[in-house]
A protein has these predicted regions:
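Catalytic cores of the polymerase beta-like nucleotidyltransferase superfamily
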Residues: 1-271
């Protein structure tokens, strides 16, 4: 990390130091002249994420920009230029020198964006998730026992999409975007790789993955410096995510409702 921050002067010298070209524009006062030395306006119109200088130099100046690229892909729905993706892949380990708090802030912004799946897929594809959220990447190597998806990773992304569909307006039962709900969606099956067992008939089981996953969730969220309440709520949802499976074909008994209410505590029923 650099000891000093240098400021460009004049304006055209400072703008190329920004993270992406779409953020490297300014209006010169008082005549409101657009200053766009890096072609940011054209990239904005094209929906392309590109760096003002080489992506390697930009990410070396501030490695958090690697995460920010994924966040903007999720937030804006932009395509990421191939050179930027290549640099993300090559320099992902540099994120290890960035404070967990800064990484967490970008991950939060990504998850509550309009297209979080897009950002997560970019993180996994470039290896950024191997550094920030390795449990998600590991799901690509785990078969979906229900054979509805290619692997548990694809299943997880589908669950994220479905969870977002459950979100409501501010006056509804699950006001969106709901960070706790979305975190639980992407983490609910992370216990499967550790609990995978193959039976003689060729089937695969993941007994206890809900409890193992809850512990793994708490550990990962603590490492990312999430607040205690978020850690508690997300890990509890992961632990309870199988609870409804036993009631798919039958009505809940009063005792089942009471047990769930006791175990879930203040978490809304609509979460699970």
């Amino acid at each position: 990390i650099r000891d000093r921050v240098t400021y460009g002067d004049p304006l055209t010298g400072d703008l190329p130091r920004r993270d992406f070209t779409v953020n490297a524009m300014a209006l010169r006062l008082p005549d409101l002249e657009l200053v766009d030395p890096c072609g940011g306006l054209a990239d904005l119109a094209a929906g392309v994420l590109r760096t003002p200088v080489s992506a390697e130099q930009s990410f070396d100046d501030d490695p958090l920009r690697i995460m920010r690229a994924a966040r903007f892909a999720a937030q804006l729905g932009f395509d990421v230029e191939m050179d930027v993706m290549t640099a993300m892949e090559e320099m992902a380990p540099r994120l290890e020198i960035v404070s967990a708090e800064r990484v967490r802030a970008e991950l939060e912004r990504l998850l509550i964006s309009p297209w979080p799946r897009r950002g997560l897929e970019l993180m996994v594809h470039t290896g950024v998730a191997d550094v920030v959220l390795p449990e998600l990447s590991a799901l690509r190597e785990t078969v979906d026992e229900h054979k509805r998806h290619k692997d548990v990773y694809e299943h997880t992304l589908t669950v994220l999409d479905q969870a977002i569909d459950l979100e409501t307006g501010p006056d509804g039962p699950v006001p969106g975007p709901d960070l706790v709900l979305r975190l639980a969606a992407i983490l609910h099956d992370i216990g499967k790789p550790a609990t995978r067992r193959f039976l003689p008939d060729g089937t695969v089981t993941f007994h206890g993955h809900d409890h193992v996953g809850a512990r793994m969730t708490a550990k990962r969220l603590r490492a990312l410096r999430f607040d205690k309440q978020t850690i508690k709520d997300v890990s509890r949802l992961v632990e309870l995510h199988l609870r409804f499976h036993g009631y798919v074909d039958a009505a809940w008994s009063d005792s089942a409702v009471r047990r769930y209410a006791t175990d879930a505590g203040p978490l809304p029923v609509s979460y699970t």
